[in-house]
């Protein structure tokens, strides 16, 4: 970087002819870069809009999704556009892949710096308190309950590599990190290191009764396409800008349910979803997501809101995937603002229509914002400021 800065600072000293030669020799102008980015972004946006329009018109998300997965030409165009945006525009614009670094930071703190131990100790204290409260209703003669001692905590720290599944991976950005045994999947991979897999229709099988080394060997011999995986296989599953891709809340629900089945006990589900609104604009929506995802057997461990996205980490707290769909319609609680847009609000888009600056930044910086400090959902403090994060109660969401 030091070799580049002087040339940038002395830019005006370079004769006009020399500057022109630099652009001709492979350095596109700002205008050319913007035009290319608008074209690539248009490809991505049209796919999202068309999926939502088809879902609103037909209502059969399974049929629409199967047809979408068969459209190889359009999916390949989408994958190429996403890869080009990530490589040539987003990373350069914001000088790094913040979403990846955030995931790395969460995993480092949880698996290697004592975060998992603290969470397990907190669970033990919570269980002890619940037992004490329940014992208060027992007969007076039963008085030897006491405060249960916290059991020794095994499996507090990672001893091997973190087995990570990146869903909708595109180009498997976690593969280069030695701490991870990363498996990237996508419906149409952009690179050979990502396996072809339709996560919505992935078949879940019984868990592998194998030693950790043997499980690692199993993952290393995977090949495309992946049609099935055993339960309790991964320590971390990443949904980065994934859930908003789907037009139906129920599809997002299926993804979270499958993630719970594929995670080991106390494994992490990391969810990153775009949102350029201010701090509390969609607080009710995030409260809704929290309730829905925790109903599956998760507990939210970390939350952060930055200018262009929400970042959440959920910990699997029960082996059994549980959810009472009779009491609440949990799938519909995984909504996004686009679910309520009318078709007329989106028909203005055309291939020759430039994206707004806000839309550019939402996608660009969705990959790049970094957290400042950890956030515990019990503390009520957000990452990016000292301002408390208030999860507003919505009577509609809290009805039983």
From Swiss-Prot:
GO molecular function: methyltransferase activity; S-adenosyl-L-methionine binding
Enzyme Commission numbers on file: 2.1.1.-
Residues involved in S-adenosyl-L-methionine binding: 99, 168, 186, 198-199, 240
Keywords associated with the record: Methyltransferase, S-adenosyl-L-methionine, Transferase
GO biological process: cellular response to amino acid starvation; methylation; negative regulation of TORC1 signaling; regulation of TORC1 signaling
Domain of life: Eukaryota
Entry similarity comment: Belongs to the BMT2/SAMTOR family.
Subunit structure: Interacts with the GATOR1 complex; interaction is disrupted when samtor binds S-adenosyl-L-methionine. Interacts with the KICSTOR complex; interaction is disrupted when samtor binds S-adenosyl-L-methionine.
Function: S-adenosyl-L-methionine-binding protein that acts as an inhibitor of mTORC1 signaling via interaction with the GATOR1 and KICSTOR complexes. Acts as a sensor of S-adenosyl-L-methionine to signal methionine sufficiency to mTORC1: in presence of methionine, binds S-adenosyl-L-methionine, leading to disrupt interaction with the GATOR1 and KICSTOR complexes and promote mTORC1 signaling. Upon methionine starvation, S-adenosyl-L-methionine levels are reduced, thereby promoting the association with GATOR1 and KICSTOR, leading to inhibit mTORC1 signaling.
Designated name of the protein: S-adenosylmethionine sensor upstream of mTORC1
Originating species: Xenopus laevis (African clawed frog)
């Amino acid at each position: 970087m030091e070799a580049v800065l002087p040339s940038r600072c002395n830019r005006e000293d370079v004769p006009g002819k020399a500057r022109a030669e630099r652009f001709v020799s492979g350095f596109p102008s700002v205008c050319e870069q913007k035009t290319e980015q608008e074209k690539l972004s248009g490809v991505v946006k049209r796919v999202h809009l068309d999926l939502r329009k088809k879902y609103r018109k037909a209502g059969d998300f399974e049929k629409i999704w199967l047809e979408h997965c068969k459209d190889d030409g359009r999916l390949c165009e989408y994958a190429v556009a996403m890869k080009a945006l990530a490589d040539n525009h987003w990373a350069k614009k914001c000088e790094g892949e913040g979403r990846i670094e955030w995931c790395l930071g969460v995993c480092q703190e949880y698996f290697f710096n004592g975060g998992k131990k603290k969470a397990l100790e907190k669970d033990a204290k919570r269980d002890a308190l619940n037992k004490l409260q329940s014992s208060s209703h027992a007969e007076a003669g039963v008085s030897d309950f006491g405060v249960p001692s916290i059991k020794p905590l095994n499996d507090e720290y990672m001893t091997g590599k973190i087995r990570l599944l990146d869903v909708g991976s595109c180009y498997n950005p976690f593969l280069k990190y030695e701490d991870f045994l990363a498996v990237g999947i996508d419906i149409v991979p952009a690179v050979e290191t990502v396996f072809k897999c339709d996560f919505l229709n992935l078949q879940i099988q019984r868990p592998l009764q194998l030693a950790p080394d043997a499980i690692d060997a199993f993952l290393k011999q995977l090949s495309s396409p992946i049609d099935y995986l055993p339960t309790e296989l991964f320590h971390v599953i990443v949904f980065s800008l994934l859930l908003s891709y789907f037009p139906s809340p129920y599809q997002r629900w299926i993804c979270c349910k499958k993630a719970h089945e594929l995670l080991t006990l106390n494994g992490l589900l990391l969810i990153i979803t775009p949102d350029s609104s201010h701090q509390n604009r969609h607080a009710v929506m995030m409260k809704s997501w929290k309730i829905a995802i925790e109903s599956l057997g998760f507990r939210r461990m970390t939350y952060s809101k930055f200018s262009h996205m929400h970042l959440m980490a959920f910990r699997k707290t029960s082996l059994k995937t549980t959810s009472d769909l009779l009491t609440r319609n949990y799938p519909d609680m995984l909504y996004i603002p686009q679910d309520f847009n009318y078709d007329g609000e989106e028909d203005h888009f055309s291939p020759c229509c430039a994206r707004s600056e806000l839309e550019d930044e939402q996608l660009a910086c969705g990959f790049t914002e970094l957290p400042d400090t950890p956030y515990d959902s019990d503390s009520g403090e957000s990452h990016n400021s000292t301002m408390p994060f208030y999860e507003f109660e919505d009577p509609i969401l809290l009805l039983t």
